[in-house]
Protein backbone atom coordinates (compact mmCIF):
# COMPACT_ATOMS: atom_id res chain seq x y z
CA UNK A 1 0.00 0.00 0.00
CA UNK A 2 1.09 3.58 -0.45
CA UNK A 3 1.04 4.59 3.21
CA UNK A 4 4.52 6.09 3.14
CA UNK A 5 3.76 8.15 0.03
CA UNK A 6 0.65 9.70 1.60
CA UNK A 7 2.39 10.22 4.95
CA UNK A 8 5.14 12.19 3.20
CA UNK A 9 2.55 14.18 1.22
CA UNK A 10 0.62 15.05 4.39
CA UNK A 11 3.72 15.80 6.42
CA UNK A 12 4.97 18.38 3.91
CA UNK A 13 1.59 19.94 3.09
CA UNK A 14 1.19 23.59 3.94
CA UNK A 15 -2.60 23.61 3.92
CA UNK A 16 -5.64 21.35 4.08
CA UNK A 17 -6.03 20.91 0.32
CA UNK A 18 -2.44 19.92 -0.35
CA UNK A 19 -2.59 17.24 2.37
CA UNK A 20 -4.40 14.99 -0.10
CA UNK A 21 -2.54 16.04 -3.21
CA UNK A 22 -5.18 18.54 -4.31
CA UNK A 23 -3.27 20.37 -7.02
CA UNK A 24 -4.09 21.22 -10.60
CA UNK A 25 -2.64 18.52 -12.87
CA UNK A 26 -1.72 21.03 -15.55
CA UNK A 27 0.24 23.61 -13.56
CA UNK A 28 0.71 21.93 -10.15
CA UNK A 29 -0.91 24.94 -8.48
CA UNK A 30 -3.21 24.55 -5.50
CA UNK A 31 -6.90 24.77 -6.23
CA UNK A 32 -8.52 28.03 -5.17
CA UNK A 33 -10.74 28.23 -2.10
CA UNK A 34 -13.71 28.77 -4.41
CA UNK A 35 -12.95 25.59 -6.36
CA UNK A 36 -12.61 23.61 -3.13
CA UNK A 37 -15.85 25.02 -1.72
CA UNK A 38 -17.64 24.06 -4.94
CA UNK A 39 -16.24 20.53 -4.70
CA UNK A 40 -17.46 20.10 -1.10
CA UNK A 41 -20.84 21.68 -1.90
CA UNK A 42 -21.31 19.22 -4.76
CA UNK A 43 -20.77 16.23 -2.46
CA UNK A 44 -23.10 17.69 0.14
CA UNK A 45 -25.77 18.38 -2.47
CA UNK A 46 -25.66 14.76 -3.69
CA UNK A 47 -26.15 13.48 -0.14
CA UNK A 48 -28.60 16.13 1.08
CA UNK A 49 -31.67 13.89 1.13
CA UNK A 50 -29.81 11.27 3.20
CA UNK A 51 -28.32 13.64 5.78
CA UNK A 52 -30.25 13.36 9.03
CA UNK A 53 -29.27 13.93 12.66
CA UNK A 54 -29.26 10.12 13.10
CA UNK A 55 -27.16 9.35 10.03
CA UNK A 56 -23.98 7.33 10.40
CA UNK A 57 -21.47 8.23 7.69
CA UNK A 58 -18.25 6.54 6.61
CA UNK A 59 -15.88 8.39 4.31
CA UNK A 60 -13.34 6.06 2.74
CA UNK A 61 -10.18 8.01 1.95
CA UNK A 62 -11.04 10.96 4.19
CA UNK A 63 -7.85 12.76 3.17
CA UNK A 64 -7.86 16.44 4.03
CA UNK A 65 -11.24 16.20 5.76
CA UNK A 66 -12.79 19.00 3.71
CA UNK A 67 -16.02 17.07 3.25
CA UNK A 68 -15.98 15.70 6.80
CA UNK A 69 -15.73 19.17 8.33
CA UNK A 70 -18.93 20.15 6.50
CA UNK A 71 -20.98 16.97 6.91
CA UNK A 72 -20.01 15.80 10.42
CA UNK A 73 -22.09 18.49 12.17
CA UNK A 74 -25.17 17.20 10.29
CA UNK A 75 -25.06 13.59 11.48
CA UNK A 76 -24.83 11.30 14.49
CA UNK A 77 -21.40 9.83 13.68
CA UNK A 78 -18.90 10.57 10.96
CA UNK A 79 -16.23 7.93 10.53
CA UNK A 80 -13.32 8.30 8.19
CA UNK A 81 -10.51 6.03 7.18
CA UNK A 82 -7.28 6.80 5.41
CA UNK A 83 -4.00 5.00 4.89
CA UNK A 84 -2.01 7.98 6.16
CA UNK A 85 -1.59 8.16 9.92
CA UNK A 86 -0.28 11.72 9.56
CA UNK A 87 -3.47 12.77 7.75
CA UNK A 88 -5.55 11.21 10.51
CA UNK A 89 -3.51 12.91 13.25
CA UNK A 90 -4.00 16.30 11.57
CA UNK A 91 -7.74 15.70 11.21
CA UNK A 92 -7.98 14.63 14.83
CA UNK A 93 -6.38 17.93 15.84
CA UNK A 94 -8.80 19.89 13.66
CA UNK A 95 -11.76 18.01 15.13
CA UNK A 96 -10.62 18.72 18.68
CA UNK A 97 -10.18 22.43 17.89
CA UNK A 98 -13.74 22.50 16.54
CA UNK A 99 -15.07 20.39 19.43
CA UNK A 100 -16.36 17.76 17.00
CA UNK A 101 -17.08 14.78 19.23
CA UNK A 102 -18.72 12.61 16.59
CA UNK A 103 -15.69 12.19 14.30
CA UNK A 104 -14.02 8.77 14.41
CA UNK A 105 -10.83 8.10 12.48
CA UNK A 106 -9.38 4.76 11.39
CA UNK A 107 -5.99 3.91 9.80
CA UNK A 108 -7.35 1.61 7.11
CA UNK A 109 -7.09 1.30 3.35
CA UNK A 110 -10.32 1.12 1.38
CA UNK A 111 -10.32 -2.68 1.33
CA UNK A 112 -9.80 -2.83 5.10
CA UNK A 113 -13.04 -1.15 6.19
CA UNK A 114 -14.36 -4.48 7.44
CA UNK A 115 -12.25 -3.79 10.55
CA UNK A 116 -14.75 -1.06 11.47
CA UNK A 117 -17.34 -3.06 13.36
CA UNK A 118 -20.46 -1.04 12.60
CA UNK A 119 -22.97 -0.36 9.85
CA UNK A 120 -23.44 2.94 8.07
CA UNK A 121 -26.30 4.81 6.42
CA UNK A 122 -23.96 6.62 4.01
CA UNK A 123 -20.61 5.52 2.63
CA UNK A 124 -18.76 8.14 0.63
CA UNK A 125 -15.70 7.83 -1.57
CA UNK A 126 -14.73 11.01 -3.34
CA UNK A 127 -11.60 11.38 -5.47
CA UNK A 128 -10.30 8.05 -4.21
CA UNK A 129 -10.89 5.41 -6.87
CA UNK A 130 -8.22 6.80 -9.22
CA UNK A 131 -5.64 5.63 -6.69
CA UNK A 132 -6.90 2.04 -6.66
CA UNK A 133 -4.64 -0.60 -8.18
CA UNK A 134 -7.25 -1.89 -10.62
CA UNK A 135 -10.69 -3.37 -11.23
CA UNK A 136 -10.28 -6.27 -8.83
CA UNK A 137 -9.39 -3.93 -5.99
CA UNK A 138 -12.38 -1.74 -6.85
CA UNK A 139 -14.65 -4.81 -6.85
CA UNK A 140 -13.33 -5.83 -3.44
CA UNK A 141 -13.93 -2.32 -2.08
CA UNK A 142 -17.48 -2.25 -3.45
CA UNK A 143 -18.18 -5.63 -1.83
CA UNK A 144 -16.82 -4.37 1.49
CA UNK A 145 -18.96 -1.22 1.24
CA UNK A 146 -22.07 -3.29 0.60
CA UNK A 147 -21.28 -5.37 3.70
CA UNK A 148 -20.95 -2.18 5.79
CA UNK A 149 -24.11 -0.44 4.58
CA UNK A 150 -27.20 -0.63 6.77
CA UNK A 151 -30.60 -1.45 5.28
CA UNK A 152 -31.56 1.24 2.83
CA UNK A 153 -28.29 3.13 3.01
CA UNK A 154 -26.47 4.71 0.11
CA UNK A 155 -22.95 4.38 -1.27
CA UNK A 156 -21.67 7.39 -3.20
CA UNK A 157 -18.62 7.21 -5.43
CA UNK A 158 -17.93 10.80 -6.44
CA UNK A 159 -15.40 12.56 -8.63
CA UNK A 160 -14.44 9.51 -10.66
CA UNK A 161 -12.20 9.78 -13.70
CA UNK A 162 -13.67 8.58 -16.99
CA UNK A 163 -11.46 5.62 -17.89
CA UNK A 164 -12.28 6.04 -21.59
CA UNK A 165 -10.63 9.47 -21.45
CA UNK A 166 -7.55 8.39 -19.50
CA UNK A 167 -5.15 8.42 -22.46
CA UNK A 168 -6.28 11.81 -23.80
CA UNK A 169 -6.15 13.26 -20.29
CA UNK A 170 -2.64 11.92 -19.76
CA UNK A 171 -1.50 13.39 -23.10
CA UNK A 172 -3.00 16.78 -22.27
CA UNK A 173 -1.15 16.89 -18.94
CA UNK A 174 2.19 16.14 -20.60
CA UNK A 175 1.75 18.92 -23.21
Regions found by a protein language model. Give the residues of each.
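A conserved beta-strand element that flanks and buttresses the S-adenosyl-L-methionine
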Residues: 124
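Conserved class I S-adenosyl-L-methionine
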Residues: 54-63
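A short, conserved alpha-helix within the catalytic core of class I
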Residues: 131-144
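Conserved beta-strand signature within the Rossmann-like core of class I S-adenosyl-L-methionine
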Residues: 152-160
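Conserved SAM-binding motif I beta-strand of class I
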Residues: 77-82
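Conserved alpha-helix/loop element of class I SAM-dependent methyltransferases that forms part
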Residues: 35-54
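Conserved SAM-binding loop of SAM-dependent methyltransferases across substrates and taxa
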Residues: 64-75
Amino acid sequence: KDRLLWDVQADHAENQAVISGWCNSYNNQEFSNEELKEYVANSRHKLESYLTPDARILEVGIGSGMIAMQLAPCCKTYSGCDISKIVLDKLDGMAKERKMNNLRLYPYAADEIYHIQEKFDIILMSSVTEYFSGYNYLRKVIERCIEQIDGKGVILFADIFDLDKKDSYRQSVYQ
